[in-house]
Amino acid sequence: MSVKGVEMPEMTWDLDVGNKWRRRKALSRIHRFWECRLRVWWLSDAGVRETDPPRPRRRPTWMTAVFHVICAVLLTLMIMAIGALIAYLRYYHQDSWRDMLHDLFCGCHYPEKCRRHHERQRRRRRAMDVPDPELGDPARRPLNGAMYYGSGCRFDTVEMVDETRPAPPALSSPETGDDSNDDAVAGGGAGGVTSPATRTTSPNALLPEWMDAVHVAVQAAVQATVQVSGPRENAVSPAT
């Protein structure tokens, strides 16, 4: 390319952009500004070839395959751990798992002062002016939030039985004087088999150690899967 008999190098793309802008009529200030920015920001094809030459495509090696397998295993374990934690909190702390998370992350451990503070907050939130005696003894009040906010789980009424502990003796009702439960407990103690209707356990007895938490969570997840996949007529009603 020659201009007035003088050999000039071939015009690159960024300079050609400026030449095209120059051919426009009545360029505004913003057009001139963007013309300048185009020259500064956008390299020509020759400049790109000089600064970033094409490299050959690297073929995956066995190290890449091992790395992908390790990443997949770690991701699977992380998802399983999150699911096990949710199952553990949901089925062993049915309504108190929110309080347990608060206990873990806030360090409150629910002393009497903190518990009453939460009760006052809930009462203010619900616009209720209920005196403390009507709520009952705070020391005997359960830590779960069933009395404050409902739960959406349809298996809240499922009784979790601890098979590793002996069942406590059932007391006869003082109104009717019915001792049928005592006979069932006595028969179960003599024969080594306890009736499922008389097996009761406290929520604190179902707290495993941290080493056994994963095993217990897997058992709870399997039990929940069996309950969900069972027939509809045998499903537990929340009203029972």
UniProtKB/Swiss-Prot annotation:
Keywords: Host membrane, Host-virus interaction, Membrane, Transmembrane, Transmembrane helix
Domain of life: Viruses
This protein's record includes keyword Transport: no
Primary site of residence: host cell
Subcellular location: Host membrane
Record field: transmembrane: 69-89
Cellular component terms (Gene Ontology): host cell membrane; membrane
Membrane topology listed for this record: Single-pass membrane protein
Entry annotated with the keyword DNA-binding: no
Region of interest: Disordered: 119-142, 164-199
Subunit and interaction comment: Interacts with host ATP1B1.
Protein family according to the UniProt entry: Belongs to the HHV-5 UL136 protein family.
The protein, known as: Protein UL136
Source organism: Human cytomegalovirus (strain Towne) (HHV-5)
Name of the gene this protein is made from: UL136
